């Protein structure tokens, strides 16, 4: 009996040591990654502030998922609190918030590269969705943000908690999207607006963060287990859908059989897209 208890105690000790070691490594990897800096030298943007540009920027803000995290007014909010994983907060993007002293190119670096003015990476910003955003679209979005009514709203701090760091250790959590991106300087010119595969691919970049880079679906990274999965969007799953079915899904939030799509999928934002953007 004494040998058995000694064996159990030893096993528990090894397990505890292993857990402590894993969390220690997770903490070290996270802190080292947060301390890394990136250089962004994309060609300077030309930001226009005419009525048409501001309207286009507002359209992008409303249809590219920005409002889901930052709010319709851009003043930021608590997105979710996932207990031991993280407290995800989207910052205030109005002139009264985080962007008030930033240049257009610094804002562009945050949007397309996930990089702060000091070169450090942004946490959990879905930059992969915006990395290929064209220069004119990016400039229009920035013009709109800079023209928003200033708000003093402070949604509080973002917190990276132990389980997020542990998942990040094993590359199971997209904590710092900047790590996965190519930061080589280049201009970005999107394909012409129209009902083409090239333009559809350009618009669909905004779906990567939830549905995955290959659009095959996944549990949305970082969200609590109770949140629904993002479904498979490839022909293997949606091969029977017609164009009208896609329009109904994105405009009405309904599947071909009439059942409702979970509101976690932000179809209300996509409903504001133009016919060309959906087609």
State where each predicted segment sits.
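The canonical Cys-X-X-Cys-His
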Residues: 57, 63-72, 107, 141, ...
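N-terminal type II signal-anchor transmembrane helix
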Residues: 2-37
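C-terminal capping alpha-helices of c-type cytochrome domains
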Residues: 18, 23, 104-110, 116, ...
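Electrostatic cytochrome c docking/interface patches
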Residues: 37-62, 101, 172-204
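Detector for the c-type heme attachment site
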Residues: 69-75, 112-113, 126, 146-147, ...
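Extended surface/linker regions that mediate inter-domain or inter-protein docking
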Residues: 13-27, 133-197
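C-type cytochrome heme-c attachment and multiheme electron-transfer modules
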Residues: 170-194, 201, 238, 249, ...
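Gly/Gly-Pro-rich "capping" loops immediately C-terminal to redox-active cysteine motifs
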Residues: 40-48, 73-106, 121-134, 162-171, ...
